[in-house]
Amino acid sequence: MSELLKNYGLDEMDRQSLLHPLTSIVDHQKSGPRIISSGSGVTLKDPSGRSILDCSGGLWCVNVGYGRPELAEAAKQAILELSFFHLFSSSSHAPAIQLADRLLSLFHRGGATHLSKVFFGTSGSDANDTAFKLVRYYNNLRGLPAKKKIISREGAYHGVTVASGSLTGIAAYHKAFDLPLPGVIHTSCPHYFRFANDGESEADFCDRLINEIEAIIAREGPETIAAFIAEPIMGTGGVLVPPAGYFSRLQAVLKEHDILLIADEVITGFGRLGTWFATEFYDLKPDIVSLAKGVTSAYFPMSVSMISERIWQVLEQASPDVGPVMHGFTYSGHPVGASIALVNLSILEDEGLVANAANMGAYLKAGLKDRVADHRFVGEVRGEGLMIAVELSADKDRRIPFARAAGAHRIVANKAFEHGLLIRPSPFIEALAFSPPLCITKDECDRSLDLFVAALAAATPELDALSGSRAAA
């Protein structure tokens, strides 16, 4: 035990030793860490033994819940059998081969039979980095070196590396990092409640979004636009559900101009929406799919990049001339991670957790609508499956948000944590996300509703004081 731990404990050791991701340094030094000591199912415990109902699912990722002995055993056996080997230079091993085959089977079963090959990484960010590079590689191999630009969307979250952070459409992730890179274009956020014009119907809003995308393609030249990247439902941005018809119309535009579609399913994949993948939910036919989080339920860092037969054919045909695909990571297809993923997928299937996400998601959303939708500071309750948000509004009738600096949703999130409920405030709009493990029960949904109602009531006096602090109408 270090002298620091003996003298001060974990709280001070944390402040002295850790640089936390996505954390205010000055606030952290004042208040210290929020330490979690254990987890089981949907429940976390802090060092004092206090229980916290985790309706954030870690970071949208603990799909099968905490403390699964089957996954611990899978990790143990994999470590004992083959603790590591790589996939470079035609090397392989059974766990990676079997996982790739199983993932393709899951997608094909859902109708995405055009997906052909699997590449492994370690995080959602690097999966989108891989997509970024493959788009360039693909068009270079086709003799189209000018076709490199990627369209993303305001409010999107695609990661924090230089490439994936550029694709992210939230300004806070760009500030002081000299992002985004040239060649990344952000179009309007498809969130009707917040961004529709006064009197604009959802159909008219969708028209405007598609017209804007077509105008960007015309302005930049379709010969320069390589891909469009989209989360089927935008997670970190605030659980932003697209307007009806958005994706069918978008795909038609992209097809017309030979533009690839990258589906970022890092959050939506592996049952979160009540279907295995959002490609099935929205009838998407993406050329690249980025996955992570739920593939191992965060028991091991692993990501997946699926590519279409269309892309594979170009790579295969060019191989004699260009040589190896010079992209990969030491831990691509790690045998321990792949072994955990295979058991994790079996748990999702055997316990019916995808169907449970659909059923419990509908129950939780209905409960939120019934119990808080009429609250004067709740603008909208929305979502699909176990991906739900409550958006706050200073003036719900006119859809006027609280001033960003006021942090109204963070106040509610902090009150929720005090009451024993963990939910996540968005860094883009004043929305609170509910994304519990897919094993959540009806009783746990009821408890989360009770805790949230109590937290919102406790926060209301502060929201009253802030309601005069509004963003411009």
Located regions from the model:
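Conserved N-terminal phosphate-binding loop of PLP-dependent enzymes in the Aspartate aminotransferase
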Residues: 2-473
